[in-house]
């Protein structure tokens, strides 16, 4: 299959490496310097080169801020039956775009962002496939993710956003709360160092990505749960209530089983 990848960042390069030995792959990035380390693939410096390539599948790996713009820019260079696909962690605007674009589409969310996951060993990672997509496109990505030994779940666009509010917004907010009051320690403990490492990883992410994940309409409710839990903990600590602390810790242990 002829596959065009938009964006030569970490995830675009990952999919290029993954697919280029089984498919004819081309990769485009508006910054040609980012194409220097791609191999076994056509490297396009201009979208005009896409016309002759005539891809059957387009994988949009542009940063989340430019996902829809990247589709819009390439649209006139694609055959009418080309399948559009995105791997964005934030799906805002995509259901409406796909409904109006006239192309078959598939939307997935590989939940192994390059900041924390080892892209050479993804056995314990997860991927979401959006159920509204094209059957052929869904089958293609399901096969890829199965070969990577990922745990695969299928959600609607709406259920995806609810899940992301829980699985990303809560840890993002908790990490920001920690980093917001963090001070440099000359001799930090193990727990502090681990939290600091996570905070540094999160802060290396694109500001727009972090913002859009936190701006998920479902996030305020999840933040409210964090605030309630912290208020409860603060009351327990302030009152030095050993029985309440034991009950609180027992509940937390039950949550992480």
Task: Give short role names for the model-derived ranges.
Residues 90, 94, 98-151, 155, ...:
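Rossmann-fold dinucleotide-binding core
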Residues 1-44, 49:
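NAD(P)+-binding Rossmann beta1-loop-alpha1 motif at the extreme N-terminus of oxidoreductases
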């Amino acid at each position: 299959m002829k596959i065009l990848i938009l964006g030569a960042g970490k995830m675009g390069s990952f999919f290029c490496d993954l697919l280029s030995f089984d498919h004819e792959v081309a990769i485009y990035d508006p910054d040609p310097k980012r194409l220097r380390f791609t191999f076994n693939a056509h490297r396009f410096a201009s979208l005009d080169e896409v016309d002759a390539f005539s891809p059957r599948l387009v994988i949009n790996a542009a940063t989340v801020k430019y996902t829809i713009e990247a589709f819009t820019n390439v649209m006139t260079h694609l055959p009418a039956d080309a399948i559009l696909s995105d791997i964005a962690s934030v799906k805002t605007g995509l259901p409406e775009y796909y409904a109006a674009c006239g192309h078959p589409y598939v939307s997935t969310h590989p939940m192994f962002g390059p900041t924390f996951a080892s892209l050479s060993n993804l056995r314990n990672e997860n991927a979401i496939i959006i159920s509204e997509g094209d059957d052929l496109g869904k089958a293609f990505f399901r096969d890829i993710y199965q070969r990577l030994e990922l745990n695969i779940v299928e959600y609607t666009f709406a259920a995806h956003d609810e899940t992301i509010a829980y699985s990303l917004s809560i840890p993002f907010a908790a990490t920001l709360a920690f980093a917001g009051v963090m001070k440099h320690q000359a001799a930090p403990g193990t727990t502090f160092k681990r939290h600091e490492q996570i905070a540094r990883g999160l802060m290396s992410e694109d500001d727009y990505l972090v913002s859009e994940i936190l701006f998920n309409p479902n996030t305020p409710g999840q933040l409210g749960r964090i605030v309630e839990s912290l208020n409860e903990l603060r009351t327990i600590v302030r009152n030095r209530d050993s029985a309440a602390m034991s009950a609180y810790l027992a509940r937390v242990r039950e949550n992480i089983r």
